[in-house]
């Protein structure tokens, strides 16, 4: 089957790889001159299935009000003048109760755990390089309340079969030795030993090269104007004067998916702006071993070979890609506070990107009401964590194979009235 994939970020390229491996003739279209040059370029670098959780959580509405008056707030909201933003925020607020949070986190962990398994298999099969580490992730708490709240997430982890350690502050240095110097600032941490890290852009570009060698065609420098539809199917992609035709089409445009699908399929995917710093390592024993997550500021610090990636925060501000100095100062403050000897912060590269976020935090993966239009978008801050699993899942569905995990509640149909998916007995389904 001829398949066109729109988007060459980590999700689009992973989709191309798995569809190619399933025997399809795949073409990837992107406006950029190469793969992973937008949202996948400089994300936080963590592959953290156990920490897969929606921003829509109990307590967030009240916290958001407090954050309005804080210099280093993890979440910022500025109205962009669109009805879509207001509708999206209202939908997000409706997902902030405990029941929705547990349901949304459960299916996010299910997909993320499966994705980590798919990445592991891909690594074993291809020996793909991306400065990866398998050292786990450590979530750091600065207050007793945060430490106590961890028990809520532990219930989901136990249901999904995810190993964990809840550590008091005196034990944090057992997994991240450099934290011994700052343990007095912390109340404890939640460590997930099976989590991984890696450079998402490096992974995506290497996978794109492998996919191209396997027969995938990449059409870079090719802006897409619109999808052409006729009745119940898509019959082409208009790119300037050219119409590119296929048997099936996959939307993986991230935050730009919503606009491209306007008038065809309604999806609640909104850009969530984030920032990162890439910092050269200064002192090896003062740098992280793997990934830490600062629960207070919602910032991750991830170790690559000779660099640290400090990333996080969320701004609901529309398609604004301006690099704001106060956000850089927040990232610098956190890394200096936790790893004062770790990196040459003054040499850091500052970056921003737009994560495609749904109001419930779960991506949209699966077929639409159009029989040949498929979606793989809306992964929010977890595109790197979920890319391989989403790509494999999409490939299975498009190829008519039964996926390894429950998938009905990942489709766009979940936003329809009266949608009741068959519930898996275990959050992670077929994971072993």
Curated annotation (Swiss-Prot):
| NCBIfam families named among the record's database cross-references | PRK00711.1
**Pfam families, A to Z:** DAO (PF01266)
What molecular functions are annotated in GO for this chain? D-amino-acid dehydrogenase activity
Residues annotated as binding FAD? 3-17
Q: Cite the EC number.
A: 1.4.99.-
Q: In which pathway does it act?
A: Amino-acid degradation; D-alanine degradation; NH(3) and pyruvate from D-alanine: step 1/1
Q: Which domain of life is it from?
A: Bacteria
Where does the record locate the signal sequence feature?
none
Q: Which GO terms describe its biological process?
A: D-alanine catabolic process
Q: Which GO terms describe its cellular component?
A: cytoplasm; plasma membrane
Q: Does the keyword NAD apply?
A: no
Protein name according to UniProt: D-amino acid dehydrogenase
């Amino acid at each position: 089957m001829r398949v066109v994939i729109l988007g060459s970020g980590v999700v689009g390229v992973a989709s191309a790889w798995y569809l190619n491996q399933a025997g399809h003739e795949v073409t990837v279209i992107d406006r950029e001159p190469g793969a992973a040059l937008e949202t996948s370029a400089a994300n936080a670098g963590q592959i953290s299935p156990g920490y897969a959780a929606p921003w829509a959580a109990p307590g967030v509405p009240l916290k958001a009000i407090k954050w309005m008056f804080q210099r280093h707030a993890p979440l910022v909201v500025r109205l962009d003048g669109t009805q879509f933003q207001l509708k999206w925020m209202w939908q997000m607020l409706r997902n902030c109760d405990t029941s929705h949070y547990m349901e949304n986190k459960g299916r996010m962990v299910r997909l993320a755990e499966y994705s980590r398994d798919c990445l592991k298999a891909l690594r074993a099969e291809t020996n793909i390089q991306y400065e990866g580490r398998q050292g786990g992730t450590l979530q750091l708490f600065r207050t007793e309340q945060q430490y106590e709240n961890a028990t809520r997430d532990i219930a989901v982890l136990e249901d999904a079969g995810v190993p964990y350690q809840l550590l008091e502050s005196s034990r944090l240095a057992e997994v991240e030795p450099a934290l011994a110097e700052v343990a007095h600032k912390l109340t404890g941490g939640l460590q997930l030993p099976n989590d991984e890290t890696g450079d998402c852009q490096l992974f995506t570009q290497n996978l794109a090269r492998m996919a191209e060698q396997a027969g995938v065609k990449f059409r870079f420098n090719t802006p897409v104007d619109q999808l052409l539809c006729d009745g119940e199917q898509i019959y082409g992609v208009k790119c300037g004067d050219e119409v590119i035709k296929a048997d099936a089409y996959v939307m993986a445009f991230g935050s730009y998916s919503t606009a491209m699908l306007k008038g065809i399929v309604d999806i609640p995917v909104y850009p969530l702006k984030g920032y990162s710093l890439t910092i050269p390592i200064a002192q090896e024993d003062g740098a992280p071993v793997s990934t830490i997550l600062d629960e207070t500021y919602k910032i991750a610090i991830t170790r690559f070979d000779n660099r640290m990636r400090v990333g996080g925060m969320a701004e609901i501000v529309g398609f604004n890609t301006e690099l704001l100095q106060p956000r850089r100062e927040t990232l610098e403050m956190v890394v200096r506070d936790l790893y004062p000897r770790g990196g040459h912060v003054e040499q850091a590269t500052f970056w921003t990107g737009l994560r495609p976020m749904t109001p419930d935090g779960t991506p949209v993966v699966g077929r639409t009401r159009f029989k040949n239009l498929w979606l793989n978008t809306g992964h929010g801050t977890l595109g790197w964590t979920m890319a391989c699993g989403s790509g494999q899942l999409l490939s299975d569905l498009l190829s008519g194979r039964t996926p390894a995990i429950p998938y009905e509640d990942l489709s766009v149909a979940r936003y329809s009235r009266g949608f009741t998916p068959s519930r898996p007995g275990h959050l992670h389904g077929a994971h072993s």
